[in-house]
Structures are given as structure tokens and as C-alpha cells.
């Protein structure tokens, strides 16, 4: 769906002018830029005819180097040569240091706990490093296409959370380029294959790149790409295959404590061996150690497959969960699209074929397919294809909701809801005269706030001081096409409102998302029981609060004996509500209700009598 091009009256909007826009695959290991030229989408090479740009940035006192120029020094200067920066985007320093082994970089923590890399060229963060990768890609595109870009579509893993997506946008802003849209990588691949092959039905997109794995189940129908379910792991990819080989090298060569340069040498050789074993059944690994000694080791494909087997099976488990979430079986999947350089590994293709029951699609270069899809989408968004009816419907990975009394979660937007989306729900006050309400936005599938992830907190002030339950506050959740969330609370009678845009200070890994989903399924029955208990406890508290207010105001309507009966039942309810028996609480509420029916009738009569006092029949 094209963005409207509006001109002032009397001026041409140049409807036939081709507008320049590109798609960028900002990858963990390599990045690419693609454009639609003469109706065909393809990646753009540099002056050396290289299509991919290594996602490597080196900082020195004399300047910043990107791509192959930086990669060439990764072994000699690993401390200042930053690789796979995408894995650090939106994550805390604590998370990185606990999850990543043998990192050669010098880190500092920012005020909010995010990583800062200390380099000879100054201190930089993952957003700034990512912008350095984007700069040569944008320059390449403008040089090749012969003009200034009107915008770019940048791809991100489907499981990138709000912080990671916002970081990607910020990186583009530092580059000085307009982001038309962030596009999920599997969705980009579906665009490329959908337009080329005209497929309709259920499609699985298996995306195994250098540092991330995503599985998406999509329904393609008459130009509509709808993501039914997503899954994956933001810390699993070809880099992990390399790490398994690297660990094997260290063990075989009896490398105990090793230098950063030796680690980097083994990493580089591990990647070369992995790529060689894609075509050959055996290859020779060779590394020169710090003493100048040549170390060699014969590595077979069988050995390599044994090392990575558990990792590959882990991706298949994610595929199984995604199919279950989508409500489809592998038999219903028409095609499986392979994306990412790591899908060239024969074991990966074989395991996917075994699980899906059919040979996966590899007709478009798996390294380029994401960039190609992004280019097609960029071409549409700038208005070069106004006749296109291509529609993208992505989904959110975890439910979004609000904390209510008793620590309960009221889900406002359910998991796997297509985005962009807006959902609204009404809430009310708990106490008489309440003039403010605190909102706690949470993410997750569990029934209690304690078991979900906190996203943000904000307060709505200026609520009219009415009786409990009389004020009406409308809470609206909006998730835009890039997966960013804004929450607005508005008191309906006055129009007073407060809002917040949720940009978490750091991200949530896909492993954690997977664990949250597993926990929600494993604890479903217990969670419902706990929710029912909490709901009854909240109801008991509301009844007691209301009754206390009534007694403070109208106790004179009751005799001492009547007051004693009510207070005895109130004390009983308070005691039972502090225990863990929902049925007993409900029974105690009913007993108290019965005991206060006469009191309620007397209050009603008294209110009517006061309202009619001094009124004649004619005035009524």
C-alpha cells in the first residue's frame, strides 16, 4: 500500500517519477542492500562486485573501518574489531556478559545498564556501531542508483522486541536516512517468493542466519501475507556452529587459556571449515598459533554434523511449536522457504525436509532473499507500484496487558494478534474519591503480574472524585507496523488523559520468550486456580471496603446487635480472605451479603426519605 504523495495546488506531484528506495538486510554476519530496477529486485554490488558487506566495524585512533577492511584485522585487533553487533542490540551488559563467552571487547555500562564499547576512537554503543554498517550500504545504493534515497526498508528478526526495533530505527536516523518501515525478515522472504512464485496457502519460512533463528508460519492468499505464528531464538545461528567447531579445535589442539587473537583465528578457521564442508565431505583445518606453530586437524562432515546436531534439533523444536501455535500441521504446509546462509549446511536442509515432509525451497539465494523482499516492499511504500494490493500482517509474539487489583493481568492485546492493531478496554476506580490511577503495562501469557514481564508504568491524574466504580477510564493499546507499543489512558467524563510509548531499556531473548510460553502451558491449570483465588480476594476486599464506608456513614440505622452480627461476619470474611480457599471466600461473601440485606434496605429507605424531604406531591 503506497504512501500518498501530496502536492500543493498547482504543483505537480510528479506521479510518473521513479522514486528511489531500497531494502536493507542488516544482518548479524553480513549485510546487503537491494533495489528494484526495471521491475526486477536484486542486491546491489560494491565496486569490487561483492554483494554482501561483512557486519564488522573496527575502531582505531585514525578512524572507523567497516566491512572487509575491518574484518581483515579481526584476528590482529579483536578488542577493537566488533563483529555480530546485532546480537548486542537492545540487551543489557549483564545479559551479554552472562550469555556470551570469551568476548574480547572492553565494556562499560551506561546509566540504564546497556553496553558501551570502549575503543581507541571513543566510546560507542550498539546503535552507533550499527549506523556505521548502514552508512556504506546507503552510499552504495545512492551511487549505483544515481540519486538520493527517499527511504529504506530495514529488516529485523521477527522476535526483535520494542527496544531492539527502536535501536535499529535510531541507527538509521544516525545515518540520515528515512525508515519507511521495519520489516520482519521471514516476511521479507515471503514477499520475494510470493511475488516470484505466486504461491497461495500455508508457507513456513525457516530463517537461520549468522546469529539468529526465526521460524514463521504464514498464510498467503490473494496478495495478503498474514503471519499466523512466529518462533525462534535470537541467540542461535551459524555463529554457534562456528563456536562448536572452535571449541573442538581448542580441545584437539590442547589450547587451555588462549589469547584473544588465537580465539579469533580459530573463529575464522571454524567458519571457513563450515563453509567448505557444505560442498565437501572432509577438509583440513589449519591455524598458526601465537608461537608461530602450524596446527592442523582433519574435520569430516560427519564429525561436524555430530557437533551441531543438538543445535539443529533445537530449531526443529521451534518449528514444531510454531506450527502448533498456528493451528496447522506440517502436512498443511505447501512450501518451506529457506533463508540465511546457514541453511546451506546439508544437515539443516535434511532435518527440515525430514520434519516438513518435503524438499525446502532454495531457488532464490538464501543470503539475498531477505534483502530482495525488503526492496520490493520499499518500492511499493514510496509509490512506485500504486496498483499493488500487497498487504502485510505481522503478529506480536507475547500478549500485552494491564495489572488490575490483586496482581492480576487483564490481557488487552492477545499473542499472535496481527499488527498494526489498536485495542481498548474500560477500567474503573476501586475506592471512593479516587483521583488518580497507576497503570502497569505487562507482557506475557501468565495470569498473575508476578509471572509476567514488566514493560512500563505511568499514572493518570485528575480523575473526578466519584464513588468507587463510577469513573470510567478507557485504556487504549496501539501497536504500530514496526511493533512499537503506545498506551493511552483517558477519563471519559473530563477527557483528561495520560500516555506512554513503551521502549524497554533492554530486550528479551527468544529463549526467554520460549520459556515464558512453555511456563504458561505447564502452569495453565495452577494459574487459573490462583487467578480465581485472587479475584475472590479482590471481591472480598471491595465488599469490606464498601461496607466499612456504609457503616461509617449510616451505622445509626442499626441496633447494637445488628452491628455486632455484621462486624462478626466482616471479621470472618477478612480472615478467610487471607487464606487460599476461593470457594470458602465466596461462601463467606454470600453469608455477609445475607447478613447485610436488611441494612441495605434501611439505607435505601433512608436515602429516599432524605430525597423526598420538603417535597410536595406536585413536585415529584
UniProtKB/Swiss-Prot annotation:
UniProt function note: Chaperone involved in the maturation of iron-sulfur cluster-containing proteins. Has a low intrinsic ATPase activity which is markedly stimulated by HscB.
Name recorded for this polypeptide: Chaperone protein HscA homolog
One Gene Ontology term of the molecular function aspect: ATP binding
HAMAP family from the UniProt entry: HscA
Any Pfam family matching the protein: HSP70
Gene3D superfamilies: 1.20.1270.10, 3.30.420.40, Actin, Chain A, domain 4, Substrate Binding Domain Of DNAk, Chain A, domain 1
Biological process according to GO: iron-sulfur cluster assembly
Family that this chain belongs to: Belongs to the heat shock protein 70 family.
InterPro entries membership: ATPase_NBD, Heat_shock_70_CS, HSP70_C_sf, HSP70_peptide-bd_sf, Hsp_70_fam, ISC_FeS_clus_asmbl_HscA
Record key words, sorted: ATP-binding, Chaperone, Nucleotide-binding
Amino acid at each position: 500500500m503506497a504512501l500518498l504523495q501530496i502536492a500543493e495546488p498547482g504543483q505537480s506531484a510528479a506521479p510518473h517519477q521513479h522514486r528511489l528506495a531500497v531494502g536493507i538486510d542488516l544482518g548479524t554476519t553480513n549485510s546487503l542492500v537491494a533495489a528494484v530496477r526495471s521491475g526486477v529486485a536484486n542486491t546491489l554490488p560494491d565496486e569490487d562486485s561483492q554483494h554482501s558487506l561483512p557486519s564488522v566495524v573496527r575502531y582505531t585512533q585514525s578512524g572507523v573501518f567497516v566491512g572487509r577492511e575491518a574484518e581483515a584485522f579481526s584476528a590482529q585487533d579483536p578488542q577493537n574489531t566488533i563483529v555480530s553487533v546485532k546480537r548486542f542490540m537492545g540487551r543489557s551488559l549483564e545479559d551479554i556478559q552472562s550469555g556470551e563467552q570469551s568476548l574480547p571487547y572492553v565494556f562499560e555500562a551506561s546509566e540504564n545498564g546497556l553496553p558501551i564499547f570502549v575503543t581507541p576512537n571513543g566510546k560507542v554503543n550498539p546503535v552507533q556501531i550499527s549506523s556505521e554498517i548502514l552508512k556504506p550500504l546507503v552510499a552504495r545504493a545512492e551511487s549505483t542508483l544515481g540519486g538520493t534515497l527517499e527511504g529504506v526498508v530495514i529488516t529485523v528478526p521477527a522476535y526483535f522486541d520494542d527496544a531492539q526495533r527502536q535501536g535499529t530505527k535510531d541507527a538509521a536516523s544516525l545515518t540520515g536516512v528515512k525508515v519507511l518501515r521495519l520489516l520482519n525478515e521471514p516476511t521479507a522472504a515471503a514477499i520475494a517468493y510470493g511475488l516470484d512464485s505466486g504461491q497461495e496457502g500455508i508457507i513456513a519460512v525457516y530463517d537461520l542466519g549468522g546469529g539468529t533463528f526465526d521460524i514463521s508460519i504464514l498464510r498467503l492468499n490473494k496478495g495478503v501475507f498474514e503471519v499466523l505464528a512466529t518462533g525462534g531464538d535470537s541467540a542461535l545461528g551459524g555463529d554457534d556452529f562456528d563456536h562448536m567447531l572452535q571449541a573442538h579445535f581448542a580441545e584437539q589442539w590442547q589450547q587451555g587459556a588462549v589469547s584473544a587473537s588465537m580465539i579469533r583465528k580459530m573463529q575464522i578457521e571454524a567458519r571457513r571449515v563450515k563453509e567448505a564442508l557444505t560442498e565437501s565431505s572432509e577438509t583440513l583445518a589449519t591455524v598458526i598459533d601465537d608461537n608461530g606453530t602450524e596446527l592442523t586437524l582433519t574435520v569430516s562432515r560427519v564429525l561436524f554434523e555430530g557437533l551441531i546436531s543438538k543445535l539443529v534439533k533445537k530449531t526443529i523444536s521451534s518449528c514444531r511449536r510454531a506450527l502448533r501455535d498456528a493451528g496447522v500441521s506440517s502436512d498443511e504446509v505447501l512450501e518451506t522457504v529457506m533463508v540465511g546462509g546457514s541453511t546451506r549446511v546439508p544437515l539443516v536442509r535434511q532435518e527440515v525436509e525430514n520434519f516438513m515432509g518435503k524438499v525446502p525451497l532454495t531457488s532464490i539465494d538464501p543470503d539475498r532473499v531477505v534483502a530482495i523482499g525488503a526492496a520490493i516492499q520499499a518500492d511499493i511504500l514510496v509509490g512506485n507500484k500504486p496498483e499493488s494490493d500487497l498487504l502485510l500482517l505481522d503478529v506480536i509474539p507475547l500478549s500485552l496487558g494491564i495489572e488490575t487489583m490483586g496482581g492480576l493481568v487483564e490481557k488487552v492485546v492477545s499473542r499472535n494478534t496481527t499488527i498494526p492493531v489498536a485495542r481498548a478496554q474500560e477500567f474503573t476506580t476501586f475506592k471512593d474519591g479516587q483521583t488518580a490511577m497507576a497503570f502497569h503495562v505487562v507482557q506475557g501469557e501468565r495470569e498473575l503480574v508476578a509471572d509476567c514481564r514488566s514493560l512500563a508504568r505511568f499514572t493518570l491524574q485528575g480523575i473526578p472524585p466519584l464513588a468507587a466504580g463510577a469513573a470510567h477510564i478507557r485504556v487504549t493499546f496501539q501497536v504500530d507496523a514496526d511493533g512499537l507499543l503506545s498506551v493511552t489512558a483517558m477519563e471519559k467524563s473530563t477527557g483528561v488523559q495520560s500516555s506512554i510509548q513503551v521502549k524497554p531499556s533492554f530486550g528479551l531473548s527468544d529463549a526467554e520468550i520460549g520459556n515464558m510460553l512453555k511456563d504458561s502451558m505447564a502452569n495453565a491449570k495452577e494459574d487459573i486456580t490462583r487467578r480465581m483465588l485472587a479475584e475472590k480476594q479482590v471481591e472480598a476486599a471491595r465488599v469490606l471496603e464498601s461496607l466499612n464506608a456504609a457503616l461509617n456513614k449510616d451505622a445509626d440505622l442499626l441496633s447494637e446487635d445488628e452491628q455486632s452480627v455484621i462486624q462478626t461476619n466482616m471479621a470472618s470474611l477478612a480472615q478467610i480472605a487471607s487464606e487460599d480457599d476461593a470457594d470458602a471466600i465466596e461462601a463467606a461473601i454470600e453469608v455477609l451479603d445475607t447478613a447485610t440485606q436488611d441494612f441495605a434496605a434501611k439505607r435505601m429507605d433512608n436515602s429516599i426519605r432524605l430525597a423526598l424531604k420538603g417535597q410536595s406531591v406536585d413536585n415529584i
